[in-house]
Amino acid sequence: MATVTARLPRARMNLWRLEWLRLRRTPRALTLAAVFVFFGLLQPLLTKYQSQIFRHVGNGVRISFPAATPAQGVGGYIGELSGTGLIVVVVVAAGAFTFDSRHGLATFLRTRVTGLWQLVAPRFTVNAAAAALAYVLGALAAWYETALLIGAPDAGGMLAGMLCAAVYLAYAVAVTAFAAGIARGTLATVGIALAILFLLPIAGVYRPVSRWLPSTLANAPVDLLRGTHHLSYYLPAFAVTVVAIAAALAVAVLRLRAREI
């Protein structure tokens, strides 16, 4: 009995290490970092030279833009938090949570844990941390490029924005786990997760609830840079997002536990 008990913590620890190695030794981590860093370097460049770009694209038609501000330089990158960057995060996370799509892998993993939470927790934590790190790397690239081409953005706003983005990306990973509890395949999981993430902001048109929506955190970095709001303004969204993350993971575990392999 003591031998079996001693093996359980080791098995749990190995699952954490397994998820870390799976992310690091495959193109997933590199893809995440590359996408965010690419847009972090590109968007300030596009913002700085948008007049020249439109002149070439528009067959010589001159279009004048006001002088770019540091907030605009970084703002283009922040937009990827609700666009390409978000899609890549969901696709990578879906690959981790849809282990039931492969019968052999599902059997192997499920027979080595005493509860489904031991499978979900490492996948959520590692993928959320990887997404946050990738975003921060891209934000640092955008920060450097903007300071070089346009002017230095507000440091406090940048750091507060990184915090908001990290929490929102953790929410996106939790929503993906929830979707994996509904659908078995990777493609269906990605579709459900993106539908939730893209449709939820529509509720923000009703002003009384807009401050409480997790999607508010996706736009927060821009407002923090512009000085429109302070970090305390987003405390309701932080609270709701944390509760939503816990609820999504709990439902994911319950759904996965009830699923037949």
Listing of model-derived features with the role each one plays in the protein:
Residues 2-6, 28-29, 33-96, 120-187, ...:
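Secretory targeting signals
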Residues 95, 99-103, 177, 254:
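Short helix-terminus and kink motifs of transmembrane alpha helices
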Residues 1-16:
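Short, membrane-interfacial amphipathic segments enriched in basic
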Residues 208-229:
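Short hydrophobic, aromatic-rich alpha-helical segments embedded in or entering the lipid bilayer
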Residues 22, 99, 112, 143-147, ...:
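Transmembrane helix-loop junction
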Residues 44, 113, 131, 201-202, ...:
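Hydrophobic transmembrane alpha-helices of multi-pass small-molecule transporters
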Residues 108-115:
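Short helix-to-coil transition segments within interhelical loops
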Residues 2, 243-261:
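Junction motif at the cytosolic side of a transmembrane helix
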